[in-house]
Amino acid sequence: MTTLNAKPDFSLFLQALSWEIDDQAGIEVRNDLLREVGRGMAGRFQPPLCNTIHQLQIELNALLAMINWGYVKLDLLAEEQAMRIVHEDLPQVGSAGEPAGTWLAPVLEGLYGRWITSQPGAFGDYVVTRDIDAEDLNSVPAQTVILYMRTRSAAT
């Protein structure tokens, strides 16, 4: 019996799974499912309590590095009473997702939503969403996802 020391590669499986989920469940159900997966991931490993956005950004980047999921930049938008979350180097599942290559973006919505609302000073009913129309997607790299965290009433 031959034993290989290589780690398994799940990219082909994930790409086929993404197509099946999209075809059978539809985009809205897929996004809801992936948001819940993100919340579940965030519950498995959480950042320590941080007193500043800068500290939180450092801690979130340390967690993302553990799973090779890119990195994040957090910006408070005082006038909009929102937080801009720019995630770079999101793993791709082939070209799946809208825009292409961003199939896992809803996972980030759940992940950041749970991570950030667990911090001191986070109060209210927050939601993390992608706002594709708010950014010029041609001006950012393909593996960059821009999210906004707002109170639920301001997001709808």
Curated annotation (Swiss-Prot):
Pathway: Glycan metabolism; bacterial cellulose biosynthesis
Keyword Transmembrane assigned: no
Keyword tags: Cellulose biosynthesis
Pfam family, any one: Cellsynth_D
Disulfide cross-links: none
InterPro entries per record: BcsD_bac (IPR022798), Cellsynth_D_sf (IPR038470)
GO biological process: cellulose biosynthetic process
Entry-linked Gene3D superfamilies: 1.20.5.3790, 3.30.70.2590
Summary of the function given for this chain in its UniProt record: May have a major role in the perfection of crystallization, involved either in the pore structure itself or in the organization of the pores within the linear array of terminal synthesizing complexes (TCs).
Name of the protein described by the UniProt record: Cellulose synthase operon protein D
Source species of the chain: Komagataeibacter sucrofermentans (strain ATCC 700178 / DSM 15973 / CECT 7291 / JCM 9730 / LMG 18788 / BPR 2001) (Acetobacter xylinus subsp. sucrofermentans)
